[in-house]
């Protein structure tokens, strides 16, 4: 059976991920008038730029929906966000500043929870606003079919008739007005924004040009810390984890992870923490550029990784980072619930996160400028007396012990010298001018 429908399935139940904006409003009304029975589903993801969630389903009913549901996805979204922090599932970074995969996390939750709600209502055809050039069309496709194997996909933006009749925002606005729904287009921004409780993504339009930087963005989760007239005072904050779970901020415990995340967003947002400018590779391998906000994710990630480095050994930390890079890419590709991702994620949560108990104190300043002021944990393996430059009682090892350890290194040093001689004879290395250190030759082959 074909899973992607190229034209509107008239007379059938069709679900649409409904945001209440012009695009989905026009699509809903158009599908209704063309003969589909339209069901509208709205995800409450805690979007910081959404004022009234309850109004969105009411709009959908006015535009002709058979049924409109608001699905609260916030708790599940925060659960997945914490899992990403625990497993370090972030593969895109620039200069050590990470993109926290907040949009991929939102799509994983939206794609599964909305399709599950549709299935309850007997709706097995799903449409959303993702375009064919982006990542979301594939993410939603995967998560939708994982949740409901009987699902078929209909996207108005892939239907040539819809494109011919309502090809742009001006046509959509005129269409709504002509049918009694005065819809005044909002002023066009220089970029588009997509957000959820974990973070915000700003991209497209002017931001497609690399000479347009972060300064054209109006933050929705933080402050424009780059502006001289933006007052940002230094602030000390403590973050506490218990067995990998963030449980307290500044001594205040939170039973509800959503409430904790909202407070983390507020604290980090006051400084513009977690904003970054990234060039990334989309699923189809074309590069795109985005400017991201994630104040709460950044705050929790910094504290979590500080405890990771103070508690775990080098090999565990190395594996955590390597696996996190791989897991981050799987998450980005819409494979967060695939077996290979679950394997990496569960391993990190079991063998890394469960040991992460403690408290980290930070001083936040402007943007990503911060200092770590204190680190406390009953599980720390950091012990300054082991390497103290002062004379200590019961030293863990002696000068004689180190002499023996260094002597054992003679074996691999000799092996390395032998290999260098082999490479020199093969013409891959030559003696450095005025130096006994070999240097690489240009590849002649």
From Swiss-Prot:
Binding-site residues for ATP, renumbered to this chain: 17-25, 43, 129, 131, 136, 194
GO biological process, one term: L-arginine biosynthetic process
Pathway info: Amino-acid biosynthesis; L-arginine biosynthesis; L-arginine from L-ornithine and carbamoyl phosphate: step 2/3
Keyword Amino-acid biosynthesis: yes
Enzyme class: ligase
EC number: 6.3.4.5
Subcellular location: Cytoplasm
Catalytic reactions of this protein: L-citrulline + L-aspartate + ATP = 2-(N(omega)-L-arginino)succinate + AMP + diphosphate + H(+)
UniProt: L-aspartate binding residues: 131, 135-136
Primary location group: cytoplasm
Family matches, as InterPro entries: Arg_succ_synth_type2_subfam, Arginosuc_syn_C, Arginosuc_syn_N, Arginosuc_synth, Arginosuc_synth_CS, Arginosuc_synth_type_1_subfam, AS_cat/multimer_dom_body, AS_multimer_C_tail
Entry-linked Pfam families: Arginosuc_syn_C (PF20979), Arginosuc_synth (PF00764)
Gene3D superfamilies registered for this protein in UniProt: 1.10.287.400, Argininosuccinate synthetase, chain A, domain 2, HUPs
Any single GO CC term annotated in Swiss-Prot or TrEMBL for this entry: cytoplasm
Binding residues for L-citrulline: 99, 135, 139, 192, 201, 203, 280
UniProt keyword annotation of tRNA-binding present: no
GO MF assignments: argininosuccinate synthase activity; ATP binding; protein homodimerization activity
Quaternary structure and partners: Homotetramer.
Name by which UniProt lists this protein: Argininosuccinate synthase
Species of origin: Rhodopseudomonas palustris (strain BisB5)
Lineage: Bacteria, Pseudomonadati, Pseudomonadota, Alphaproteobacteria, Hyphomicrobiales
Gene that encodes the chain: argG
């Amino acid at each position: 059976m074909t899973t992607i429908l190229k034209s509107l399935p008239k007379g059938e139940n069709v679900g649409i991920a409904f945001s209440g904006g012009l695009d989905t409003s026009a699509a809903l009304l158009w599908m209704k008038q063309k003969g589909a029975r339209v069901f509208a589903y709205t995800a409450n993801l805690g979007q910081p730029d959404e004022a009234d969630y309850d109004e969105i389903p009411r709009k959908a009913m006015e535009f002709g929906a058979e049924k409109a549901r608001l699905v609260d996805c916030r708790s599940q979204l925060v659960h997945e966000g914490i899992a990403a922090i625990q497993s370090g599932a972030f593969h895109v970074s620039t200069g050590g500043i990470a993109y926290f995969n907040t949009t991929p996390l939102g799509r994983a939750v939206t794609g599964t929870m909305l399709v599950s709600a549709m299935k309850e209502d007997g709706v097995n055809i799903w449409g959303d606003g993702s375009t064919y050039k982006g990542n979301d069309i594939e993410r939603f496709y995967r998560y939708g079919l994982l949740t409901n194997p009987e699902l078929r996909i209909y996207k108005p933006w892939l239907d040539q008739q819809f494109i011919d009749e309502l090809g742009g925002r001006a046509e959509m606005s005129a269409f709504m007005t002509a049918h009694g729904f005065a819809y005044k287009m909002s002023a066009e921004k220089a970029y588009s924004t997509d957000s959820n409780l974990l973070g915000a993504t700003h991209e497209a339009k002017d931001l497609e040009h690399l000479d347009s930087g972060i300064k054209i963005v109006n933050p929705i989760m933080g402050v424009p810390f780059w502006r001289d007239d933006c007052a940002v005072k230094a602030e000390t904050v403590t973050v506490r984890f218990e067995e990998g779970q963030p449980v307290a901020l500044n001594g205040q415990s939170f039973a509800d992870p959503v409430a904790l995340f909202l407070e983390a967003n507020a604290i980090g947002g006051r400084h513009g923490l977690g904003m970054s400018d990234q060039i990334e590779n989309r699923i189809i391998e074309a590069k795109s550029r985005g400017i991201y906000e994630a104040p709460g994710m950044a705050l929790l990630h910094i504290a979590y990784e500080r405890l990771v480095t103070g508690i775990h050994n080098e090999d565990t930390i190395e594996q955590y980072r390597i696996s996190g890079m791989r897991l981050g890419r799987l998450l980005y590709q819409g494979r967060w619930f695939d077996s290979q991702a679950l394997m990496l994620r569960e391993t990190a949560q079991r063998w890394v996160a469960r040991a992460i108990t403690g408290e980290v104190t930070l001083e936040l300043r402007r943007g990503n400028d911060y200092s770590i002021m204190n680190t406390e944990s009953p599980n720390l393996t950091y012990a300054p007396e082991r390497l103290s430059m002062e004379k200590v009682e019961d030293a863990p090892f002696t000068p004689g012990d180190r002499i023996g350890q260094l002597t054992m290194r003679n074996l691999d040093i000799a092996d390395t010298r032998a290999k260098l001689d082999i490479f020199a004879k093969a013409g891959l290395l030559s003696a450095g001018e005025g130096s006994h250190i070999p240097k690489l030759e240009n590849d002649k082959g």
